[in-house]
């Protein structure tokens, strides 16, 4: 292995971990909904796939659109996470059996898009720098999948401690993360 490849591997691994921590944080909030292990596995895989597809799409888009779509992707992702958080808080205080947004079907799709939109922007910049696309998307997918699982499992544990208030706390975490994206400091 050449030093150049090792340098790129380390750089992309650090970047993949950073993007995956977003998925961990949001997974922590979503994990406070009562989830089965099969659902946790499925959610992690879907998030991982989106963390492969989004940067790949970003790399394909290249530098032509990076200035406009880069910030737009961040704002869309922040808005989706904010909306999911509000809906989770509403569901926590509503007298119903299930969450307002289910982490399956269209709810999972919104969740995955919201969490992975920042990786689209990263893909745009990686496309301009000529990074190895296969290595980048593989690392992004693996890190985000594993960190999503960790967040969901940790959220599940917190849910067992907090009971019915855990979904409201999960919603607050998603709102906070969405606001962080919408209102950069």
Swiss-Prot record:
Recorded GO cellular component terms are: plasma membrane
What's the main place this protein lives?
membrane
Q: Which residues form a coiled coil?
A: none
Tell me which InterPro entries the record gives: Mntp/YtaF, Put_MntP
Q: Name one Pfam family in it.
A: Mntp
- Give the subcellular location: Cell membrane
Where are the membrane-spanning stretches? 4-24, 40-60, 64-84, 108-128, 134-154, 165-185
Alphabetically ordered keywords of this record = Cell membrane, Ion transport, Manganese, Membrane, Transmembrane, Transmembrane helix, Transport
Its annotated function is as follows: Probably functions as a manganese efflux pump.
Q: Which protein, by its recorded name, is this? A: Putative manganese efflux pump MntP
Q: Which organism is it from?
A: Bacillus velezensis (strain DSM 23117 / BGSC 10A6 / LMG 26770 / FZB42) (Bacillus amyloliquefaciens subsp. plantarum)
Taxonomy of origin reads: Bacteria, Bacillati, Bacillota, Bacilli, Bacillales
């Amino acid at each position: 292995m050449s030093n150049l490849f090792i340098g790129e591997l380390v750089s992309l691994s650090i970047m993949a971990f950073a993007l995956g921590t977003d998925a961990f944080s949001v997974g922590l909030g979503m994990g406070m909904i009562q989830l089965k292990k099969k659902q946790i596995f499925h959610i992690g895989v879907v998030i991982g796939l989106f963390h492969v597809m989004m940067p790949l799409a970003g790399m394909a888009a290249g530098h032509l659109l990076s200035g406009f779509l880069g910030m737009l992707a961040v704002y869309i992702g922040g808005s989706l996470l904010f909306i999911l958080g509000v809906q989770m808080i509403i569901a926590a205080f509503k007298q119903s059996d299930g969450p307002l947004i289910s982490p399956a079907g269209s709810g999972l799709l919104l969740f995955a898009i919201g969490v992975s939109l920042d990786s689209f922007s990263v893909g745009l910049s990686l496309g301009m720098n000529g990074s190895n696309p296969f290595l980048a998307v593989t690392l992004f997918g693996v890190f985000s999948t594993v960190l999503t699982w960790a967040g969901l499992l940790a959220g599940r544990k917190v849910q067992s401690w907090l009971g019915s208030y855990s979904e409201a706390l999960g919603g607050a975490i998603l709102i906070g993360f969405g606001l962080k994206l919408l209102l950069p400091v």
